[in-house]
Design a protein with these regions (language model features):
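Flexible loop/turn segments at secondary-structure boundaries
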Residues: 90-92, 174-176, 222-224, 237-238, ...
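Catalytic core of non-heme Fe(II) oxygenases with the double-stranded beta-helix
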Residues: 154-155, 180, 188-251, 257, ...
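Fe(II)/2-oxoglutarate
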Residues: 1-76, 333-341, 345, 349-388
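C-terminal/domain-terminus segments
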Residues: 233-243, 283-292, 373-388
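Extracellular structured ligand-interaction cores
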Residues: 81, 165, 179, 209-215, ...
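Non-heme Fe(II)-dependent double-stranded beta-helix
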Residues: 27-193
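Catalytic core of Fe(II)/2-oxoglutarate
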Residues: 242-318
Length: 388
């Protein structure tokens, strides 16, 4: 009896994975307003919610749960994007935060440590890495008023569940600042294509569930100022992390992306697998400031704390002296092989999307036969760079 092999999806993807026609059909969908009954409108396939109604729903458990359920469906199975109008209704809170951010940008420029951008050309914008902590330390009262917004909390919990981890980065796009390259985002979106392809296919489905992207508008943003370009439904295309850099996908994005004008205090949230990028600021006199929220699942962490630096120091002489070991396997069990979280002010990416890891430095030291004392100084310097 001949057995038929099961029709299984591929265990790994590659640079050619993903059918363009399938992608085109997915992003050609039209949103059905019946799927988002709590939205006040649907504009260009993106559901729009009223901030006052969100605040009211947050105070009633059943309404809160219904809203989060609707949002979870939008992020996973709908457009992947939602807007909360007047999510931070008190403009004095936004204005004070903007003043804090302007001062931080000025101070960091004077110190020559202003943040670069992973997807934009140098000079197009000003960045504040870790604006969350810097904002909190500069003005704790304003920080508390800012992050007390129900829309931020409900969107984060709708996608990630409780105990999420908030991070934030300010992006101020300068007059004439060019658009970002359209992309997917953290985690897999911060890797080279070759590195992405090393992760099994099911991880390409997991990555979007570990992060939520958000933005707080700090000024009015007509389309000419370059609000975020978004491609609704694109998070539904499974192979997108590897496929979206191909020319036909980039061309389709350029012809079909959506930009919605925003007002000060509006909130935008989207699945990190949505193809997106900051738009070109076509104005000559308007600085477009947003605070980008990158919220992470509590599940993106190991169960135990491990002092990997101490382990690497102990193992380094063994790895140098012992023959017959499968060194890569030992490195994988010991050294920190992932570059995040890190301090992007003191440990910025050089020649790529992410900084070098402890495992990278260990491999490099072993290959070069680096003396212990010299390598240990490298480890100590890396630990210092990673601190906030």
């Amino acid at each position: 009896m001949t057995r038929t092999a099961p029709n299984r999806p591929p265990g790994w993807l590659n640079a050619d994975s993903g059918d363009f026609e399938t992608f085109r059909q997915i992003v050609s969908q039209t949103a059905d307003p019946a799927d988002t009954p709590l939205a006040s409108a649907v504009v260009r396939n993106i559901p729009i919610y009223d901030g006052a109604q969100v605040d009211a729903a947050a105070l009633h458990p059943a309404r809160r749960q219904a809203l989060m359920q609707e949002w979870a469906h939008v992020f996973a199975h709908g457009a992947g994007i939602l807007v909360i109008k007047r999510g931070v209704a008190d403009h004095s809170v936004i204005d004070r935060a903007s003043s804090v951010f302007d001062q931080i940008i000025a101070d960091e420029k004077r110190a020559a440590k202003g943040g670069g951008d992973h997807f934009a050309k140098p000079g197009a914008n000003d960045r504040i890495w870790n604006s969350l902590e810097k904002h909190c330390l500069a003005d704790p009262a304003n920080f508390a008023a800012y992050y007390s917004a129900h829309g931020i909390a409900l969107a984060s919990e709708a996608w990630l569940g409780p105990a999420y981890q908030m991070t934030a980065q300010v992006n101020r796009v300068n007059p004439g600042g060019a658009a970002q390259t359209p992309h997917r985002d953290y985690h897999l979106g911060f890797m080279s294509g070759a590195r992405m392809a090393q992760f099994p296919a099911h991880i390409h489905a997991v990555s979007p569930t570990l992060t939520l992207q958000g933005a707080v508008a700090h000024c009015d943003m007509p389309v000419e100022t370059g609000p975020t370009m978004l491609l609704p439904f694109s998070q539904q295309f499974f192979e997108g992390y590897l496929a979206f850099s191909r020319p036909e996908f980039q061309a389709h994005f350029a012809a079909h992306y959506v930009q919605l004008p925003l007002q000060k205090g509006d909130l935008v949230f989207f699945n990190p697998a949505v193809m997106h990028g900051a738009g070109t600021n076509h104005t000559t006199d308007r600085f477009r400031m947003v605070n980008l929220l990158q919220v992470s699942s509590a599940f993106g962490r190991a169960m135990e704390t491990v002092n990997r630096t101490r382990m690497v120091r102990a193992l380094y002489p063994v790895l140098r002296a012992t023959a017959g070991l499968n060194v890569e396997n030992v490195i994988a069990a010991t050294a920190e092989g992932y570059p995040f979280p890190t301090n992007l002010d003191s440990n910025p990416p050089v020649g790529g999307m992410a900084p070098k890891t402890q495992a990278d430095y260990l491999r490099q030291a072993l290959s070069a036969g680096q003396p212990e004392a010299e390598f240990f100084l490298t480890l100590e310097a890396l630990d210092q760079k990673n601190k906030s």
